[in-house]
Amino acid sequence: MATKIKFKYKGQDLEVDISKVKKVWKVGKMVSFTYDDNGKTGRGAVSEKDAPKELLNMIGKK
């Protein structure tokens, strides 16, 4: 089963498959990321403590 990242963006609860994540970086205690949203670039952020290990392992990698 693929890992899903659950996060809030502009008041909406969203979920994205980790395979769609493009770039991951850390801002303070938050982990920010961009992902492929059907041809558009989506953005999201999740707290470091709530982030899946797979996402944390992607920090700084392309």
Swiss-Prot record:
It is found in: Cytoplasm. Keywords: Cytoplasm, DNA-binding. Pfam families: 7kD_DNA_binding. GO terms for cellular component: cytoplasm. InterPro entries: Chromo-like_dom_sf, DNA-bd_7a-e_arc. Its main location: cytoplasm. Highly stable from pH 0 to pH 12. It comes from the Archaea. Hyperthermostable. One of its GO terms (molecular function) is DNA binding. Can constrain negative DNA supercoils. May be involved in maintaining the integrity of the genome at high temperature. NCBIfam families: Sul7d. Belongs to the 7 kDa DNA-binding/endoribonuclease P2 family. Monomer. This is DNA-binding protein 7. It comes from Metallosphaera sedula (strain ATCC 51363 / DSM 5348 / JCM 9185 / NBRC 15509 / TH2).
